[in-house]
């Protein structure tokens, strides 16, 4: 499975109603500065994956994002994949998604 998903692919999944668990894993300080995310996605602390990983459904694909699709998303994606989840992160992160789909 690919590690990344494009903003176009994600928008298509959301519009089609595909089963996906979307996670906002921005650093706490980034989230607190600007809490608006993609489709009212719940925020999960990227520094505390062990505290919330057990709450995720294994049957759904997990798509996560940080601000720019960098080290935060990549680190969390790896932890989820290593635990057996189908996980990808948004290429370019929240910034890219908001540019591609500004009304989301």
Question: Predicted segments — roles?
Answer:
Residues 1-20, 28-63, 68-104:
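Rhodanese-like catalytic fold shared by cysteine-dependent sulfurtransferases
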